[in-house]
């Protein structure tokens, strides 16, 4: 931090919620839920790239993610638009030992934002995580006031702050 008590925005807020009292996900007409198991790894990769366009994440990087334990294509959730575009994406990482799952990352294609897709995707994803055996769900976001969109989404579906990190980086003049 630049000074004691300062907030330069470079910190993460970690959020948690129990997988109880889950709302039914609601999508706009003709949108539908899919998984990477349904659409294949190439389409799931494109959804990721579209959600964070422009992205420095290489197209080939998703193959490494998909090959990493505990990646499961049935827990890589997506929303498909009526025209076939994969409009929202989230990967759920599930640890069966701790019975905890984490959303990372969560994103919506820029042409489909502010339509409730992220909210619906998270409700659907939490139900899938619970059905897989999870009892607790986690998600992280940038924590400062300048980054309210993700925090608003996550808190809107019942996540509450668990902890935060503090970057210890010396600033050079």
What are the language-model segments listed below?
Residues 1, 154, 159:
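Conserved active-site tyrosine of GNAT-family acetyltransferases
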Residues 32-44:
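A short beta-loop-alpha structural element at the N-terminal edge
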Residues 105-108, 114-131, 151-156:
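Conserved acetyl-CoA-binding loop-helix of GNAT-fold acetyltransferases
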Residues 1-29, 166-170:
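Acyl-donor-binding surface of acyltransferase catalytic domains
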């Amino acid at each position: 931090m630049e000074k004691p008590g300062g907030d330069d925005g470079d910190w993460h807020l970690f959020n948690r919620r129990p997988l109880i009292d889950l709302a039914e996900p609601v999508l706009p007409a003709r949108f539908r839920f899919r998984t990477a198991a349904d659409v294949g790894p190439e389409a799931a990769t494109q959804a990721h790239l579209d959600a964070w366009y422009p992205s420095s994440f290489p197209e080939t990087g998703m193959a490494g993610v998909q090959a990493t334990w505990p990646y499961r294509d049935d827990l890589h959730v997506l929303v498909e638009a009526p025209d076939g575009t994969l409009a929202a994406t989230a990967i759920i990482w599930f640890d069966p030992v701790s019975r905890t799952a984490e959303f990372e990352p969560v994103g919506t294609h820029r042409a489909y934002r502010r339509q409730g897709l992220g909210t619906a995707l998270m409700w659907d994803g939490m139900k899938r995580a619970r059905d897989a055996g999870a009892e607790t769900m986690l998600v992280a976001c940038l924590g400062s006031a300048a980054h309210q969109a993700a925090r608003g989404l996550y808190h809107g579906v019942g996540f509450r702050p668990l902890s935060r990190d503090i970057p210890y980086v010396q600033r050079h003049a």
